Amino acid sequence: MRIDYSIDHAVQLEVNFEVEGFTILLGQSGEGKTTLLRAVAGLLPARGEPFGGLLPQQRAVGYLPQGYALFPHLRAWENVAFALPRGPQRRPQALELLARVRLVDVAERYPPALSGGQQQRVALARALARKPQLLLLDEPSSALDAATRDEVMAELISEMHEFGLPALAVSHDPHLAALADRVAVMSGRRIVQQGTPAEVLSRPGSPAVARLLGHRNLFTARVVGHENSSTTLLRWEAANGITLRLLRQSELTAGQLVQWMIAPTAVRLPSLKPELYRPDNPVTGRVESRLNLGAYFQVALSCGSERLWVAATSDLVRHHGLETGSEITVDLGNNGLVC
């Protein structure tokens, strides 16, 4: 489903992106993410598709506002029934919807007696009562505690897949991006990048996108010039003035100060087979810390006055004997450098 909307009310906004499965629209506070949801739901004047020109009650959308907006004085089933037509089938239909989200056993409880995840699923059942074609979620993880956030969100996304219902969730939390089927990034009140989580997280389109995604390896360098038709040279002054080579960026000029980034997964340790190791951008650093995360280690290298984060396989870390204080030369490559 394509979202194509222009908004002049409250904030000026023009966006165009795809919703596939569970899609996260990521952006900082104030970008207009909630405004977009309200416009798609018909609660704000806007131009666009889908549902353009329809009254709110005519739009096949389910809307989960931030905090879920459950009525505290109504039982769980009564909150769901609030979205259903009056009649003798109202309660059975509400209980059926609660059963779909595996909550029929708490139907008689009031919202304050429910966990954050249970409240979210009651709100989901209420949204499903409208038989929506699209589900809209505003900051779905904001009311969840850190200890249960991943589990609750993973269960919610699994339910979306079971229902075959496309969902658009807006958030400023980059952690959610990894759980989604698709990610769209908003900056400057426009979509600046979209794709699968693997595509967007591994290669942000700009340092600004990298910051939104929570990347740590963000640095400043000075442009030296262009070495040839395919290479641009940068001087990383804070890391002892080493020279970096990246794919040619013709718009950069000598002397210009630029931001650049590299994903921790793009930083390469020397291969187990030295004859296969041909570094493009060798950088030497000293191990400040390392954290064993099971399949890989998160390693912090001190490079001059900068800290470079590396995600390295356990085999490579053990092979090179990386311990706090040891020195290692890694390769930044050139394809992974984003400027």
Language-model-derived ranges and their functions:
Residues 189-190:
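Conserved ABC ATPase "signature" C-loop
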Residues 129-133:
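A short, proline-enriched helix->beta-strand linker immediately N-terminal to the Walker B motif
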Residues 135-139:
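Catalytic Walker B motif of ABC-type/P-loop ATPase nucleotide-binding domains
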